[in-house]
């Protein structure tokens, strides 16, 4: 089979026709001739006379190939075409069919082509149509090399050849610096990474890149342009690669599989990040505190803790977050969306952290054990936080008041005290709270729900903490002891209020009259003086009370119930406070001391009466004769003089 020659792919122009061409068309003639020459040489074909190249480069008229070739053949303008530049018959047929097809579309029916020119007259182009022919030819010759695999076309054979390598997966060009393999164009760009060279700079923000394509993609951040749209859901993206990855969500395709655990991913980058879980690799280290992270994004978001920056802001309520995922989860509060579903029971949550906590209900496995106290946890993070109780470490400090906390979440909640922020609102009554847990407990007032029941007496409570405190009544446990006088209490709150007796502090102040008290209960009782509203009425006798607790205590009088029993003598009482006072008879405890004379009493009421001796105050007056007394009992005895009753 005959091989391709330089003349086999030629369209001819006569000297007369040549004169009709303008300079731009003549330049095109030269470029096409040179391109064809180079393509044939790159395939190993030999052109006999090297002077041909000089002729083509300096061309001012159609090149006379008689001078440059052994066979006397007329001048020609060449337009390259080849699948692989195979033997002459295939190339001639394909080339001429393509040229004719392209030219016919342009309306040049009179153009005639031949397979291998022998005379000038064999290839004729009508005068006056040369300009159109050249326009067609310039389009044709610019996309002439076609890939067999993907039908992509190229203007240069060398580009076509490079492109074909992509289908084989072969990357023949190796980086001498790191040994990685690339395609030629990619290698050039890659070497810039080692050199630190970033010649492409963004005019908007000044950020520099080592690739022009990277700069082009970056610019879309400023313009907001998202040219790549998903046909499935209409979502738009800045980059085609991101769109391709996104499409896998719809197809369910997960081509990247972890060899360690078999988990599959839609992206290779996600797989690479996942592998760090198995290797334990944490390459991204915080310069501020030394903490290491698996992912660069985690490090960047962690840095916000040190800077205090909260770049992610909710458009709905204005709340700002350090992490983008925290903002995304927060948005679910506004939308009501609960995307995190428990696989075991189907319960849904609006935050992933809530789901993680919930899962521990189903799984009793607690792998992480505290060496200090033996307490076990389902998560290592929980163990690390727990350890701070033993070490006393409180890394999260409030900038407002200096108070420190074990956990960042506790600090976040604490800050609301200073800001006054109450983001959790009750839909029932409109009352707002600064903690979600407080809102949940509040809702039980409306629902009447009391899920925490005492096994001892059957009493139910809205809070687990209240139940735990209540249990101490049955056990007699008093873990909170006063260092000043040794008195012990069931509740820490009671101890704190008791301390006010020793310090003389009276933090509970009445807004109506300004009177202050050292105990909150004293203020609550006092308030009833100003308010005559008694909402809680006894159905038995009609007596009304300002507090529900007072009504409940009162009801025991009618029922005869005496649940508070003295272990010492067996005597029972309807009030826990009465039992407490009674116990002092057995213990001999006299916690109430007169500051004037040092005398001690077992009841506060006895101390109050005693103080009248020192003050001389006589607040109990006889309505009959006006005589005054310092004790009500003395007044009662005195009244018998007027009634005529004898003193018994």
From Swiss-Prot:
SMART domains: KRAB, ZnF_C2H2
PANTHER family from the UniProt entry: ZFP14 ZINC FINGER PROTEIN-RELATED, ZINC FINGER AND BTB DOMAIN-CONTAINING
ZnF segments: C2H2-type: 145-167, 173-194, 200-222, 228-250, 256-278, 284-306, 312-334, 340-362, 368-390, 396-418, 424-446, 452-474, 480-502, 508-530, 536-558, 564-586, 592-614, 620-642
Native organism taxonomy: Eukaryota, Metazoa, Chordata, Craniata, Vertebrata
Subcellular location per the Swiss-Prot or TrEMBL entry: Nucleus
Pfam family, one: KRAB
Major localization listed first in the record, in broad terms: nucleus
Keywords of this entry: DNA-binding, Metal-binding, Nucleus, Repeat, Transcription, Transcription regulation, Zinc, Zinc-finger
Native source species: Homo sapiens
Listed name of the protein: Zinc finger protein 595
Domain of life: Eukaryota
GO cellular component: nucleus
UniProt similarity note: Belongs to the krueppel C2H2-type zinc-finger protein family.
Gene that specifies this protein: ZNF595
Domain annotation KRAB: ranges: 4-75
GO terms (BP aspect): regulation of transcription by RNA polymerase II
One of the record's GO molecular function terms: RNA polymerase II cis-regulatory region sequence-specific DNA binding
Function: May be involved in transcriptional regulation.
């Amino acid at each position: 089979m005959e091989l391709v020659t330089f003349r086999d792919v030629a369209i001819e122009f006569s000297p007369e026709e040549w004169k009709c061409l303008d300079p731009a068309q003549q330049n095109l003639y030269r470029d096409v001739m040179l391109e064809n020459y180079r393509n044939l040489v790159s395939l190993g074909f030999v052109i006999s006379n090297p002077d041909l190249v000089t002729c083509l480069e300096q061309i001012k008229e159609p090149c006379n190939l008689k001078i440059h070739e052994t066979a006397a053949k007329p001048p020609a303008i060449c337009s390259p075409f080849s699948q692989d530049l195979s033997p002459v018959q295939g190339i001639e047929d394909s080339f001429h069919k393509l040229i004719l097809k392209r030219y016919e579309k342009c309306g040049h029916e009179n153009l005639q082509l031949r397979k291998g020119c022998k005379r000038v007259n064999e290839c004729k182009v009508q005068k006056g149509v040369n300009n159109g022919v050249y326009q067609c030819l310039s389009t044709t010759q610019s996309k002439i090399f076609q890939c067999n695999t993907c039908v992509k076309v190229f203007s240069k054979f060398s580009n076509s050849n490079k492109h074909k390598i992509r289908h084989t997966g072969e990357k023949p060009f190796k980086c001498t610096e790191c040994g990685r393999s690339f395609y030629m164009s990619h290698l050039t760009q890659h070497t810039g990474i080692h050199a630190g060279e970033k010649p492409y700079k963004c005019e908007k923000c000044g950020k520099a890149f080592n690739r022009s394509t990277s700069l082009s993609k970056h610019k879309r951040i400023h313009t907001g342009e998202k040219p790549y749209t998903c046909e499935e859901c209409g979502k738009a993206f800045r980059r085609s690669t991101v769109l391709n990855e996104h499409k896998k969500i719809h197809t369910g395709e997960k081509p990247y599989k972890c060899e360690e655990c078999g988990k599959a991913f839609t992206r290779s980058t996600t797989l690479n990040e996942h592998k760090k879980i198995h290797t334990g690799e944490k390459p991204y280290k915080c310069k501020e505190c030394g903490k290491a992270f698996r992912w660069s994004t985690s490090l960047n978001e962690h840095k916000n803790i040190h800077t205090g920056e909260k770049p992610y802001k909710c458009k709905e309520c204005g709340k700002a977050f350090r992490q983008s995922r925290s903002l995304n989860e927060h948005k679910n509060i506004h939308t009501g969306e609960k995307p995190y579903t428990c696989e075991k029971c189907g319960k849904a949550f609006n935050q992933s952290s809530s789901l993680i906590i919930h899962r521990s209900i189903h799984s009793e496995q607690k792998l992480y054990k505290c060496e200090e106290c033996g307490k076990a946890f389902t998560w290592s993070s929980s163990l690390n936080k727990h350890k701070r109780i033993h070490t006393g470490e409180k890394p999260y400090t409030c900038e407002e008041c200096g108070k420190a906390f074990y956990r960042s979440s506790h600090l976040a909640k604490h800050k609301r005290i200073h800001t006054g922020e109450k983001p959790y609102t009750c839909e029932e009554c409109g009352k707002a709270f600064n903690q979600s847990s407080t809102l949940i407990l509040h809702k039980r007032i409306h629902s009447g729900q009391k899920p925490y029941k005492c096994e001892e007496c059957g009493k139910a409570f809205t809070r687990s903490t209240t139940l735990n405190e209540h249990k101490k009544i049955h056990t007699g446990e008093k873990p909170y002891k006063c260092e000043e006088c040794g008195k012990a209490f069931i509740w820490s709150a009671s101890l704190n209020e008791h301390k006010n007796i020793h310090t003389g502090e009276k933090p509970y102040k009445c807004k109506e009259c300004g009177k202050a008290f050292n105990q909150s209960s004293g203020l609550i009782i006092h308030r009833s003086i100003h308010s005559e509203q008694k909402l809680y009425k006894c159905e038995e006798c009609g007596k009304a009370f300002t507090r529900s607790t007072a009504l409940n205590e009162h009801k025991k009088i009618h029922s005869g119930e005496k649940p508070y029993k003295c272990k010492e003598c067996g005597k029972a009482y309807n009030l826990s406070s009465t039992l407490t006072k009674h116990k002092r008879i057995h213990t001999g405890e006299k916690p109430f001391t007169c500051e004037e004379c040092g005398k001690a009493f077992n009841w506060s009421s006895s101390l109050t009466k005693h103080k009248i001796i020192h003050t001389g105050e006589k607040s109990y007056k006889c309505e009959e004769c006006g005589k005054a007394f310092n004790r009500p009992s003395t007044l009662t005895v005195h009244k018998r003089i007027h009634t005529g009753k004898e003193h018994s």
